[in-house]
Amino acid sequence: IGNTLYAHELNGDDAAIFKSGTNNVVKNNYPMSTDIIIDVNNAWIGKEAVIGITLNSAATGTANIMVGGKTYTVNLTDGKATLKVSDLPAGENTVKVDYDGDGKFKSSTNSTTFKVFDGIVTNETFFDYFINGTLADYVPEGATLDFRGKFYSHDDVKFDLVINKPINMISTTGDAFIDLNTTAGSLLGENPGSCFTINNGGSGSNVSGIIFHNTQVWIYDAHNVVLNNISVIVENKRVGSGVGTTAIRHGSTNVTLKNSYIYTSNNGGSSSIVLTHVQNCTVENNTIVGEGNVGNLLYLNTFNDAGCDLSNDYNKIINNKITGPSPAAGICYGIGINGNNNLIAGNVINYAGNGIVPAWGATPNNNTYCDNVLIGGASMSVAASSIAYNNTVSGTLTIGSGSVAYNNTAKAISVSSNSVVSNSSATAALTVQAGAKVANVTAASLSVSGKNAVIENVSISGVGTIKSSATNTTLINSTFGGMLTVQSAKNTIKYNNIVLATGDAAILATGGDNVITNNYLIAGDKLGDNAVNSTVETNIVKDNLPGGIVNVTITAKDVFEGSDVIIDVTVDSLSNLTEKFMLKINNKEYVL
């Protein structure tokens, strides 16, 4: 014990050899043996691989570490040393450690292997990058993961995918196809099933060029995320129940979904793209298609997100192409809106149902709707206190209370209370509610149903009706191709033009205390005031034109050249005329 022993090639304990005897003790003779423990984790290409070696704490001197085709000499401190190497090739690397020994310890050697990953993810390398569904520790922030080929989850192999740090997810081969075989649980959304998830830790991530099939896409409390040129295809599978197949939710901000294809078919009636309690998010230039039993195609939602009360504000839904199912379904909106100060612009919706409307039970405000085109009969309802302009709507355009709308075209326009509508046209009805202001609008018919409305410079090809509830209506400077019926009281009707080839009245007034003056009215042979059929004596009907038919007769006798000629002009009218006439003879004018 404790001797220094050398014998030829033997040393330390190995140099003590007993030919006979029992119970001999041989230990701690110098130089002693020491194991080399190598500690190295898998590394990311271009990043440092940290290699730690541990010998007996009393070992001194140096050790040689061979890795990546190079040899590095390190000094031992308390029997330990650490080497950081960053220029290692991708794949499996071998690290070998040689210790030359010192006076106390003999030489020894050991080796092990570790991997350097380059971010190429296949169904064979997937579990190198995702440990228990989340990114491995050695995948650094900002890494690029290049997904290649198909990833099918099934009973034997389950590809859980949670992005919990900021990375870039791409497919250079263009064939990344991820099917997590999602089956949603409750319709209330608390069990969305297997998901592709970007959580708060994954904020700052970018995903592009990936196809997700029958897979819940779940962006949860994440920020500054971009989903670009992805496909989310759900076919005949219960995906998105209560949350939407592509769900951006729970306080997420600055998330962008753009240039992507979202297709949903028969998923049990759930929505496609759903933004729930999010702000400053953008859904732009996507193609969104729904077929069969599907829910809303794009939806700003507030349901099924416990623990978050952030309102859906300052989001942008722009330049998307949306096609709804045929036939239309009551549970499917093209775009459903809940929240404030959102921009809905440049979208094209082909659908026979509700194209752009407030979400069920929602009271959104202060949103902007512009440059949207709705075809196929789709309707559009503008939220209260909002702005709508340059929209083309093949169905009914409803302007919410307190809103401002201009330069819109629709099949029919419904103007809610206290809103302002101008410079627009409808091929069918224009309906106006209380306190609304309407100017420079064309339509096939007019119906006013609320009090205190102001309507001017409208052009109506057919009839107009001021209903019994529409008191104190002001109608001025407008044109009608059919009769105007005034059923309510205390209205002002001035400077309008109604010319009817047939009939007994241009205006039928059944309410009282109306002022009907200075209009141009013709109904068959009824002119001016005579073209007003007032059934109530309290109406004021006067100064309506024309006053009557004017017949002018001109006679003159032949005379010799150079002599004066006498020309007789006779004017017949149903009323007394006070204005002057002009007589023109051989291009010379005479005032009579």
Model-derived segments and spans:
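Acidic/polar low-complexity surface segments
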Residues: 2-15, 20, 179-191, 234-242, ...
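Consensus "Asn ladder" position of solenoid repeat domains
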Residues: 3, 8, 24, 29, ...
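Structural detector of coil-to-beta-strand junctions
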Residues: 14-17, 158-160, 193-197, 216-218, ...
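Solvent-exposed beta-strand/loop surfaces, strongest in extracytoplasmic domains of secreted
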Residues: 26-118, 540-592
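Short beta-strand/loop motifs in extracellular/secreted proteins, especially
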Residues: 59-63, 143, 205, 225, ...
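Acidic Gly/Asp/Thr-rich repetitive segments characteristic of extracellular carbohydrate-active
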Residues: 119-154
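Extracellular beta-strand-rich solenoid/capping regions of secreted or surface-exposed proteins
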Residues: 153-170, 178-225, 237-252, 274-278, ...
